A protein has these predicted regions:
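Charged, low-complexity terminal tails
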Residues: 1-37
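Basic, flexible Lys/Arg- and Gly-enriched helix-loop patches that mediate nucleic-acid binding at interfaces
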Residues: 25, 32-296
Length: 296
């Protein structure tokens, strides 16, 4: 864990004008970037640097796959992020090329974008918290992928099934944001018999955290005295949502498995298995999300 240091404000390049000053390497790079931006603006070149120098810290962290931008904000506010040895508490702090950025003391490197589909086994946690003693998704996948990735959304510890993994924060934001409404399908194993009448009632939805959640689809796959199997598709993403909706109708879930995310099915992926997404799968998933939100 990075020790919290007193937050320092940036000094203007060139110092205060009182006495001789020495530029740090970062000040030199900032000055060069500013000069380049000003030059680009004068000659009419459309350049990102002509408007701002560097990249916002929260955006930079998300782009490197640390987590979604919202989660990166939380890490910054929590004092987990340092730049060049100084803890930064402002998500809008500008990161320059060559800056040493660390999260919990671990240096974050710029790398290529990674996208994977993973089958999370039951009992595994969707967290990167190093203080956690239970098995985490990252403990299983880190040896199998060429860079750091995070889970796109969550599955609770007792659930199993499909998870997307990436180091692309923008992709993660698109897939998880409620306005995009990516459909996810679950198979739920109930520990008692239920009827088609029970299913009809549950199709009306239930209030979860003050918001009414209505399944996109809900069907009874089988039912007997020993138990029942239900398939539910939703486009929300609240904590333990499927279990909570069914519980409103006295359906007690003993096992839950996510079998589909958008256009991606479980197919031949075994528990603990992982595979990269194809470019077409990734592009189709993003297009599906944007279409659902009306951005297409």
């Amino acid at each position: 864990m990075v020790s919290r240091r007193k937050k320092t404000s940036r000094k203007p390049i060139g110092g205060s004008g009182r006495g001789k000053t020495t530029r740090t390497k970062r000040q030199t790079r900032l000055a060069a970037a500013t000069i380049e931006a000003s030059s680009s603006a004068r000659v009419g070149v459309a350049s990102e640097k002509s408007q701002t120098v560097g990249v916002r810290l929260n955006k930079w962290l998300a782009e490197q796959g640390v987590d979604s931008r919202r989660k990166c904000d939380e890490k910054v506010f929590g004092g987990e992020v340092s730049v060049n040895g100084t803890v930064i508490l402002e998500p809008g702090y500008r990161v320059l090329d060559g800056d040493d950025v660390r999260v919990d003391g671990v240096k974050i490197s710029v790398g290529r974008r990674l996208y994977y589909l993973f089958y999370k086994p039951k009992g595994v946690l969707c967290t990167n918290d190093p203080r956690e003693t239970d098995t985490r998704v990252c403990d299983l996948v880190d040896p199998m992928v060429p860079g750091r990735v995070h889970t796109v959304g969550r599955l609770d510890k007792e659930s199993e099934g499909l998870l997307l993994l990436t180091n692309d924060g923008d992709f993660s934001q698109i897939i998880t944001h409620p306005s995009y409404g990516i459909r996810k399908t679950y198979v739920c194993y109930i520990n008692h018999a239920i009827t088609h009448a029970d299913i009809e009632k549950a199709r009306e939805g239930a209030y979860i955290d003050g918001v009414k959640v209505v399944p996109e689809s809900l069907r009874l796959m089988r039912s007997s005295k020993k138990g029942a199997t239900v398939e539910m598709t939703i486009s929300e993403g609240r904590n333990r949502e499927v279990r909570r909706v069914l519980a409103r109708f006295d359906m007690r879930v003993k096992r839950l498995k996510r079998v589909r995310i958008g256009n991606l099915g479980v197919a031949k992926l075994k528990r603990g298995g992982i595979r990269p997404l194809t470019k077409k799968e990734r592009d189709d998933l993003v297009a599906m999300a944007r279409s659902s939100s009306g951005d297409a």
